[in-house]
């Protein structure tokens, strides 16, 4: 493997074929998880360190379950109580973990680009579990897997992503994956939460930008709502939550305009009653709980790949 190929920092470094191979492996891993004994010895003897510098529920637990299902030794690292609180640098922490025998590090960090720094100083494999606004590749992979398992393919799907586009690491990773696999993507939201269109089209020229959701719904195969980060209200990027919900909130009335085969997704955590309503989040066509379930199989597939 080349230096970057040893790591999964974002999907920009994965070809369409490689992404498809991960999704295919995830299908096999889902079969493992359906058994009475949900474990295979694929990573026996390997040590996976989950190093989370940000709070997480779904991603952290999903990675722990995935690694254990592959029979890996799993170590949960938290910054609280560690030498990081005493001033140890991120690089020194990683070198310590390497000296202790870590084979794979799964890292979440608040600073965009932190995984690139770690990757330069770690001889094993690094999986990015989310860094700042930059990337969340395993969320994108599980989203792709969910779309494919529900709709049969990714190519030519029209995927509408609505919400706080500008500040979302999920969007960026999904754009790499969706465009590589031939989907059509529309980013939708208030202009202040999308930013300049050229910011997106310079990297993904095939992506469309829209500021109204309703006209997109009759032709959408997938609608993915993003969490509205309430702190944006304080910075003046939104006039009022009620106004946002009126124009962009996923209500049962609004989703009645979708084609019968369409699905609704959300990477979580959700602000119910703001970007999505409870009756929508827990009933068809929503597949939000399915996304969470699929995350274990997808992360098993990626860990298996990273272990060589």
Swiss-Prot record:
EC number(s) reported in the record: 2.1.3.2
Binding site for L-aspartate: 86, 169, 227
Pfam families, per the entry: OTCace, OTCace_N
Keyword Transferase appears in the UniProt entry: yes
Alphabetical GO biological process terms: 'de novo' pyrimidine nucleobase biosynthetic process; 'de novo' UMP biosynthetic process; amino acid metabolic process
Complex and partners: Heterododecamer (2C3:3R2) of six catalytic PyrB chains organized as two trimers (C3), and six regulatory PyrI chains organized as three dimers (R2).
Record function comment: Catalyzes the condensation of carbamoyl phosphate and aspartate to form carbamoyl aspartate and inorganic phosphate, the committed step in the de novo pyrimidine nucleotide biosynthesis pathway.
UniProt family annotation: Belongs to the aspartate/ornithine carbamoyltransferase superfamily. ATCase family.
Name under which the protein is recorded: Aspartate carbamoyltransferase catalytic subunit
Species assigned in the record: Chloroflexus aurantiacus (strain ATCC 29364 / DSM 637 / Y-400-fl)
Protein encoded by which gene: pyrB
């Amino acid at each position: 493997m080349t230096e970057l190929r040893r790591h999964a920092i974002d999907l920009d470094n994965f070809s369409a074929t490689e992404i498809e191979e991960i999704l295919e492996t995830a299908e096999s891993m889902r079969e493992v998880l359906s058994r009475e004994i949900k474990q295979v010895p694929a990573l026996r003897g390997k040590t996976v360190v989950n190093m989370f510098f940000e709070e997480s529920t779904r991603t952290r637990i999903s990675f722990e379950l995935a690694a254990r299902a592959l029979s890996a030794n799993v170590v949960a690292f938290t910054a609280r109580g560690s030498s990081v609180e005493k001033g140890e640098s991120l690089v020194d922490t990683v070198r310590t973990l390497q000296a202790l025998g870590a084979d794979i590090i799964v890292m979440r960090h608040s600073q965009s680009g932190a995984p690139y720094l770690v990757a330069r100083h770690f001889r094993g494999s690094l999986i990015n579990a989310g860094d700042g606004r930059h990337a969340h590749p395993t969320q994108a992979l599980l989203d792709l897997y969910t779309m494919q398992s529900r709709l049969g393919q990714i190519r030519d799907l029209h995927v509408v992503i609505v919400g706080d586009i500008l500040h979302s690491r999920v969007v960026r990773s999904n754009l790499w994956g969706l465009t590589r696999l031939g989907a059509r993507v529309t980013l939708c939201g208030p202009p202040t939460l999308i930013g300049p269109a050229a910011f997106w089209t310079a990297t993904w020229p095939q992506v469309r930008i829209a500021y109204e959701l309703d006209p997109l719904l009759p032709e959408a195969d997938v609608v993915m709502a993003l969490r509205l980060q309430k702190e944006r209200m304080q910075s003046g990027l939104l006039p009022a939550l009620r106004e946002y919900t009126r124009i962009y909130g996923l209500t049962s009335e609004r989703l009645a305009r979708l084609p019968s085969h369409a699905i609704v997704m959300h990477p979580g955590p959700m602000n119910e009653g703001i970007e999505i309503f409870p009756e929508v989040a827990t009933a068809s066509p929503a597949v939000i709980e399915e996304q969470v379930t699929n995350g274990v199989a997808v992360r098993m597939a990626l860990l298996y790949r990273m272990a060589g």
